[in-house]
Amino acid sequence: LFRSVALSWIALSLMGALPYVLTGALDSYVDAVFETVSGLTTTGSTVFPEVEHLPYSVLLWRSLTQWMGGMGVLVLFLALMPKLGDGAVYLMRAESPGPIKSKLVPKVGSTAKILYGIYVALTVLEMACLRIAGLSWFSAVNHAFTTMATGGFSINNTSLAGSSPAVMWIITVFSFLAGVNFSLLFLAATGKLRTALRSEELRVYTTIVVSVTLLICVCLRVQAGVPLGESVTDAAFQTVTIMTTTGFATVDFALWPTFCRMALLVLMFTGGCAGSTSGGMK
């Protein structure tokens, strides 16, 4: 089963590279495979020096590869679960982005459907919020895909620089949710919110986000003279997107004070919760 997961990723990577080559976006198949693997693994690295000149179809495909890779190949689960029976538990362990201590529901197939349903619902909700906040539908769809996957591909050369505070806060909230253990989101979705909130992992995750946000906010306000409102928004946005390895940027934080940069560096390694779409050590 572990071999099946590995072979599936390889096959998806090789096939997913074809749109880049067939559309002429990339001349090299090797570059196309790199871009696809970067998307499916939500790494976020790219071979494109600029992306704004790319056709909408290619931009959408880039974002879609990250969204598909964000929760693993749950579609594959839905197809294989009935045939694999109890063996599917081991497949989920091989594919899931974090440790699984127990089954969320008695049947693994039902678990996969529920988790994927939560993933889709949050993605659609973010699309709607971003559209209301002023983004075009195309931009809202692409950034919702890559936010929930914590991948960070953007359709803009400058990522999300120049975005309104409303857009930044929406991205911040959904990046935070994407960094939460999906088993806790499952509990919340099934009416067990109090049980989810009692999770020690969630408390530590939230404490780190809030604490680092406040520290960076104070640092920006005192050392860099950034206005209070702007410092709060920038600090929260970069803290969450960096910790969850979403990787969006609205400012050049390389110019921030040393303390801020060191704090963000540590967060990159920390990552979000186990069982989330985020990267890092979790």
Where are the regions that the model predicts?
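Membrane-proximal intracellular helices of multi-pass ion channels
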Residues: 2-282
